[in-house]
Amino acid sequence: MKKFFFLFLALGLIISGALPSFVGAHESSEGKKHAFSKQLKAISKKTYCYFEDFTNEETGLPYDAVRMKDGEISPQDFTSPTNIGMYYMSTVSAEEIGIISREEAVSRIQTSLETLEEAEKWHGLFYNWYYTKDGSLMTDWGEFISTVDNGWLSAGLIVAGQAYPELNDQTSKLVDAMDYSTLYDPEVGQMRGGYDVKTESLTAHHYGAFYTEPRVASYISIGKGDVPEEHWWKMYRTMPDSWDWQSQKPEGYTETYDGVDVFEGHYTYNEQKYVPSWGGSMFEALMPGLVLKEKELGKNALGLNNKRHVDIQIEYATEEMGYSAWGLSPAATPDNYSEFGATPLGMSGYSAEGAIVTPHATFLALDYAPKEVYKNLKTLKDFGAYGKYGFYDSVNVKTGEVTQAYLALDQGMSMVAIANYLEDGIIKDYFHQDEIGKNPEELLKKETFSIN
């Protein structure tokens, strides 16, 4: 989602906090589960402190990131639609877990909504960057309307509106005004990457790969009625087998859904079949499942594939790469921001050579491998990767170097994943209560991937 993690100012102070001690080997299974839940709640409390300390009180907009070093904290005091959407869902999560009161949650989100109502937009869609101090447009990196980022803001608005009915009028008006048809290419049946307002041009590329994080924007666009349902079937499960640039030649068959032929292709890793993402990263695969009921409704497709990606991520990192911890996904590095993934899981897989592991990838796996998550968190804690605002953004598991940074996006993914695990999928429930989340559910149910 973020192709670059922009140059940082001075780096800031490590403020460490003790991670709740992990459960002992002799406790009962139920006792371990209860203790692990307590640990996750304690982690979520620290994680949400990021949004408490780094959200502008006047505008309700969260900072993009902070870095820490040598007694200084360097905040990135601009934000994106994705950051705002994750802030809303994190705030709902914090209230559901019991970290903040309902009144505080409503107040926080309402302040932010008032800023969004006045913010500059294009066909109701939000630009990529705004200053947190006043909600004004930030144009340092252009004037871009991002399909995927608007999708995550829409998701956050939908969740907030369902969690707090008194905010629903505001959230619904904002979502209704977001016209995704302007980003849709009916000739191809796919969403464009976005629109450059300055040059008045759509991106040349489309979001053609199905199993990536933009599928949330696609789902919402269909749920709103901005684009036709056939769009869901026009995305590639794998690229056609004749496209020889992809990392594997896919196997599979053609299935017809709603009159559209879909090549149900798959790749294979150590005899495990899966539908690939673009880069093989955890957040491409599992971030959409924070709001979409893929596990519950897509048992023969997305839900099963999510489990395969978790299993292969763990196997690839620990066995093939020989790392002591797993969780390969784009993350901050000591000097920048880079893309990492389990290379075989991607059509054009990101590298895993840097040995950079990011904690948000661990939390995203909670629904599919809680025991492995517990063990991995303990390993990451042993690297010293836990501080005042929860887990730092990444650690080099070969050198032990911890990237002393926190990103709003990654903090948000961790918060929502924990809330869904502790509160039985509460964020997904709120999303699917809305007609936009409910209307396309049949698309999740009816498909069967060729990985069964």
Language model features with spans:
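Ser/Thr/Asn(+Pro)-rich, low-complexity disordered segments
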Residues: 26-452
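Sec-dependent signal peptide cleavage junction
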Residues: 17-28
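Short amphipathic alpha-helical "recognition" segments used for binding
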Residues: 6-7, 317
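Positively charged n-region of N-terminal signal peptides that target proteins for export
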Residues: 1-4
